[in-house]
Amino acid sequence: MSKKIHGGSVVEMQGDEMTRIIWELIKEKLILPYVELDLHSYDLGIENRDATNDQVTKDAAEAIKKYNVGVKCATITPDEKRVEEFKLKQMWKSPNGTIRNILGGTVFREAIICKNIPRLVTGWVKPIIIGRHAYGDQYRATDFVVPGPGKVEITFTPKDGSQKVTYLVHSFEEGGGVAMGMYNQDKSIEDFAHSSFQMALSKGWPLYLSTKNTILKKYDGRFKDIFQEIYDKQYKSQFEAQKIWYEHRLIDDMVAQAMKSEGGFIWACKNYDGDVQSDSVAQGYGSLGMMTSVLICPDGKTVEAEAAHGTVTRHYRMHQKGQETSTNPIASIFAWSRGLAHRARLDNNTELSFFAKALEEVCIETIEAGFMTKDLAACIKGLPNVQRSDYLNTFEFMDKLGENLKAKLAQAKL
């Protein structure tokens, strides 16, 4: 490869701790030597978020809206300890949540699979991509303890002043209990549906929506109906052209089906189900260090990619003391590759598309050739049995990936 590939506009968000160090290494060794990017950089490190009163996070989200592609490093979401550690002005919200609220869209998690890394669910040979509808339901519910006997009712008061409607939830006759009122909005469910259909089309895999509409006939039934209506009107012919399909499944049936399957599908989950199943599926594949997270907006055009893990604080503390670390960079590299692949699709850029694919192949081929970080060696041998010769440290592994990428691209006729 003799010349740099022209890559176009990408919004890049720097993060915190060990992942911030890895992020810079990825740019320096794997991206910028080969791709000429119009980079719009935003420092989402906790100190800068504090200094800008979190305005930098909002600015980054607006930039993603404008340029359609964002790649994000893992960031600290502060708790009380972090507020004290960094002497923060306040406990700033999760940057991921802020960005998601501005962009809308659905977060899809996907495992990165290597043949030599054992999976807890051995039958999963292809990824299962989980899309979580991260809005409403239990997460925006009003719940309370019922102090004693009495009635719990839900009332809807129309804005136009017409007749109120009241429903009896439960009559507490002996003692109290607990009660909850939760909601969702058609617009949010519609956006969730569009993002899910767009994801299925981009991967060329079937899509399943899981609900419990047999019990929550009106509530979950609404999800089922909206998905079906949008599919029939706007996506059915595109799905059939790709020989893929959309189906609604009951959540219990879907969980059992997923366990028996070989993977290779998109699973659209309601908020709580997605929260639970995404972690369950991640563990089934073996490692959160090998899990990507992509936010897809309903327009199918705007995408933000990141690793599904945190900032690897424990390794950062070791690094600060000058101790050796072996931190897995793969999910962070895939944030870049997925972002660049999307940029390539938008711009019809075959060279950039080839590069993004080559970068992912190099990561998998390097691990399958036996060069890996300590966490992956532990997946294979069990942590107590891992010796120093079984793995590379953070910087050695990045160098190895850099060397292998250089060799792969040298063979390519670009």
Curated annotation (Swiss-Prot):
The record marks 139, 212 as: Critical for catalysis. Signal peptide: none annotated. Substrate binds at residues 77, 94-100, 109, 132, 212. InterPro entries: IsoCit/isopropylmalate_DH_CS, Isocitrate_DH_NADP, IsoPropMal-DH-like_dom. Mn(2+) binds at residues 252, 275, 279. One of its GO terms (molecular function) is magnesium ion binding. Binds 1 Mg(2+) or Mn(2+) ion per subunit. The modification N6-acetyllysine is found at residues 81, 224, 233, 243, 321. The modification N6-succinyllysine is found at residues 126, 400. It is found in: Cytoplasm, Cytosol. It catalyses: D-threo-isocitrate + NADP(+) = 2-oxoglutarate + CO2 + NADPH. The keyword Cytoplasm applies. Acetylation at Lys-374 dramatically reduces catalytic activity. It comes from the Eukaryota. Its main location: cytoplasm. The modification Phosphoserine is found at residue 389. Belongs to the isocitrate and isopropylmalate dehydrogenases family. Catalyzes the NADP(+)-dependent oxidative decarboxylation of isocitrate (D-threo-isocitrate) to 2-ketoglutarate (2-oxoglutarate), which is required by other enzymes such as the phytanoyl-CoA dioxygenase. Plays a critical role in the generation of NADPH, an important cofactor in many biosynthesis pathways. May act as a corneal epithelial crystallin and may be involved in maintaining corneal epithelial transparency. This is Isocitrate dehydrogenase [NADP] cytoplasmic. It comes from Microtus mexicanus (Mexican vole). The gene is IDH1.
